[in-house]
């Protein structure tokens, strides 16, 4: 199976790359810039700045599955409107753009990892699959 991975340099992404390579999947990583830390087995596609809604078409050729981990977790400008806009651009618009491009390229599966934060900030018991999302802050809203 040929997999395109975004967010491959992040915390989860690095671990996932190692495991997928170990299991002999064919991995491509859509990255902002080349990264020398990837194993040689990982093909890198430089798509540039994710805030500019990049064209992923070259990286989607012959891909069976997209695993989308990339996202914005921190914004420096703390004005609430700016923060939400910054998160929305990457966590919502980029995700939708990539999903549309993947569908147009004939990709069979699109896996998107979100965040537990979409369920709210506090709970005294574990969240359940049928719980209604209750995002409380701009990051969580953008991941919902």
Summary of predicted features, one role per range:
Residues 30-35, 49-50:
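N-terminal Rossmann-fold cofactor-binding loop
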Residues 96-139:
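Conserved Rossmann-fold NAD(P)-dependent oxidoreductase catalytic core, especially the SDR/UDP-sugar
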Residues 142:
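Active-site helix of classical SDR
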